[in-house]
Amino acid sequence: MASGVQVADEVCRIFYDMKVRKCSTPEEVKKRKKAVIFCLSPDKKCIIVEEGKEILVGDVGVTVTDPFKHFVEMLPEKDCRYALYDASFETKESKKEELMFFLWAPEQAPLKSKMIYASSKDAIKKKFQGIKHECQANGPEDLNRACIAEKLGGSLVVAFEGSPV
């Protein structure tokens, strides 16, 4: 079911910048986004970047000790959101970084909000071509490291964001 909600150009630009890794100077790498949260505009017609709801690679280890925990804490308790998270994880063979797309729809969110976010998900997913991992979370229990490791590769994943799973 389509909702007719549009996706802002800035959302598409952020996705492209997170997906495409260019050769960058250390300063440019620090400005790369680790996580970004998206919301509906006040008129509910467009998916936009939620102001102030991002983690930069340069923040990790400086102002943010655990990027995934910080990301989860940025999500509202009583409303829905979309998010992109640049997951760093290790398998038994190698270290990897892959983008994850999240639909956050907590139980306490208003029914109308859950409906519009669910029906608008396809619009944003069409813009996010090449996402390997998608996760719908309905509460904090869906966002623990073990659940995320399962989405990233199950028993092959041995560490997520530097912590064993």
From Swiss-Prot:
**For the modification N-acetylalanine, which residues carry it?**
2
Q: Which GO terms describe its molecular function?
A: actin filament binding
Q: Which domain of life is it from?
A: Eukaryota
The family database entries (InterPro entries) matched by this protein are listed as:
ADF-H (IPR002108), ADF-H/Gelsolin-like_dom_sf (IPR029006), ADF/Cofilin (IPR017904)
GO BP of this protein = actin filament fragmentation; actin filament severing
Give the location of motif Nuclear localization signal in residue numbers. 30-34
Give the record's GO CC terms: actin cytoskeleton; cytoplasm
| Family indicated by similarity | Belongs to the actin-binding proteins ADF family.
Q: Which PANTHER family match?
A: COFILIN-RELATED
Protein name in the entry: Destrin
Q: Which organism is it from?
A: Gallus gallus
